[in-house]
Amino acid sequence: MIKCFDKNNEVYNLIKNLTERLNIEILEVNIFRNKNGGKIQIVLYSKDFSLGIDLLTDLHKMILLILEASLEYSFTLELSTPGIDRRIKSDREFQIFEGKKIKLMLDNEFEEGFILESKSKSFIFKTESKELNVSYSDVKKARLV
């Protein structure tokens, strides 16, 4: 299985022009391969609009055409959105989810707050009572709420 956000990933590179033009972020690409073909799972997100079922259906058709024209193995394609309680998996996702409410674990307990601003090595986390500059390396867990 290839599970990643990797800018060198073949699937990512095949669909990035389409998603960039539509102002949609590729959060994750999971590729499962076996002797009979494979399965490709892609998680998409947009800050500007909701990715509802109708839009995902249209995106599925467009992405499927792009991938079928280029990939030399049979596969099924699954598209999804991050979901309300997505675990934040990378520094890049803190930038993507700027302004969103999260649960953050730094020590051994969760705190709820908002990602105010994402920087190269840290982000500003605002709770009801304080603002913290949090280094990505200090984050034990984080998820959307």
Curated annotation (Swiss-Prot):
Its main location: cytoplasm. It is found in: Cytoplasm. It comes from Borrelia garinii subsp. bavariensis (strain ATCC BAA-2496 / DSM 23469 / PBi). InterPro entries: Ribosome_maturation_RimP, RimP_N, RimP_N_sf. Transmembrane segments: none annotated. The keyword Cytoplasm applies. Belongs to the RimP family. It comes from the Bacteria. Keywords: Cytoplasm, Ribosome biogenesis. Required for maturation of 30S ribosomal subunits. SUPFAM superfamilies: YhbC-like, N-terminal domain. This is Ribosome maturation factor RimP. The keyword Cytoplasm applies. The gene is rimP. GO terms for biological process: ribosomal small subunit assembly; translation. Pfam families: RimP_N (PF02576). GO terms for cellular component: cytosol.
